[in-house]
Amino acid sequence: MTSHPVFIDLSLDEQVQELRKYFKKLGAEISSEKSNKGVEDDLHKIIGVCDVCFKDGEPSQIDGILNSIVSIMITIPLDRGENIVLAYCEKMTKAPNQPLGKVCLQSLWRLFNNLDTASPLRYHVYYHLVQVAKQCEQVLEVFTGVDQLKTQFANCPPSSEQMQKLYRLLHDVTKDTNMELSSKVMIELLGTYTADNACVAREDAMKCIVTALADPNTFLLDPLLALKPVRFLEGDLIHDLLSIFVSDKLPSYVQFYEDHKEFVNSQGLNHEQNMKKMRLLTFMQLAESNPEMTFDTLTKELQITEDEVEPFVIQVLKTKLVRARLDQANRKVHISSTMHRTFGAPQWEQLRDLLQAWKENLSSVRDGLTNVSSAQLELARTQKLIH
């Protein structure tokens, strides 16, 4: 979202006077005279009634009024501005419809970008900014990822408690429209807990697991098991279910669902979607150790009919998690490569061996090219002497 700098060609006193008169004219309970207590008291009074303009004003006119208020707010010293900023943010969450919500969103974004980057008030503004963005379906305009979020607060990082609160909000506003982003947010949230307080993160850990399992684009689930809050769930059904998605095959999930159908449904998980994901994960695991698989093997392991094998493999190839070739004539699937479901010590050793082999091959190629080059130079010198 773009934001224009705040600039009003009036003195603070003149702006305050005009704003008081404007809101008084709209019927707000506010005096048209300036406060003798100073501009901060004026702002408190103006912000207290500023939502009056939401009733009848045009969005463009309201935007100008809010811009004027913001231009005054950013002149208030940090130590005296917190209550004013918080009051304004609360008012911006009260927009009665989407068009005005977008105006309020723009105003908060303007305030956020005009505050000093080292100001702790930016956190509070951003939190309300996300709330308003949700109301007018503009979340991705203000939040595109965790890295972008950390960059915005680099000069004044919020406390762990503040970030936990913000991550929970971001999860809530993205879970219905961008499950992959929502899942990343929850993983980041769990990463804010330490060994000392991980035991209190039970609800967050469960949400994180459910979000990751439900996300059709999240397949590498092994890292979740290393998160401290998730470790505290060991022995719980949700942890057992996660472990199945991390390393077990389809039959294990089918058995779990038969034994705990009510639990799975209570978590908001869709059984058919779980089956679809477990089939893909099972295929990946089979591909790790089988360079080729028969259709018969796949029908048995994936619990599908032979007619469903080809469409299934095509869907797998679209994910780019596995590289393979269908051999319809011989009813086989030839595997070129696959992403590993888990990445532990064995996978690191395999990667090391592969890189070492590449290094040795490159050394051989280099030595060969050096020998060829030397031979050509020697031949050129010999021919020169002859002539």
From Swiss-Prot:
Function: Component of the eukaryotic translation initiation factor 3 (eIF-3) complex, which is involved in protein synthesis of a specialized repertoire of mRNAs and, together with other initiation factors, stimulates binding of mRNA and methionyl-tRNAi to the 40S ribosome. The eIF-3 complex specifically targets and initiates translation of a subset of mRNAs involved in cell proliferation.
Pfam families: eIF3m_C_helix, PCI
InterPro entries listed in its UniProt record: ARM-type_fold, COPS7/eIF3m, eIF3m, eIF3m_C_helix, PCI_dom, WH_DNA-bd_sf
Keyword 4Fe-4S applies: no
Protein family (similarity comment): Belongs to the eIF-3 subunit M family.
Organism: Drosophila pseudoobscura pseudoobscura (Fruit fly)
GO terms classed as biological process: formation of cytoplasmic translation initiation complex; protein secretion
A single MF term (Gene Ontology): translation initiation factor activity
Compartmental location: Cytoplasm; Golgi apparatus
PCI domain residues: 181-340
The protein's assembly and partners: Component of the eukaryotic translation initiation factor 3 (eIF-3) complex. The eIF-3 complex interacts with pix.
Name of the featured protein: Eukaryotic translation initiation factor 3 subunit M
Swiss-Prot/TrEMBL keywords: Cytoplasm, Golgi apparatus, Initiation factor, Protein biosynthesis
Gene Ontology cellular-component terms listed: eukaryotic 43S preinitiation complex; eukaryotic 48S preinitiation complex; eukaryotic translation initiation factor 3 complex, eIF3m; Golgi apparatus
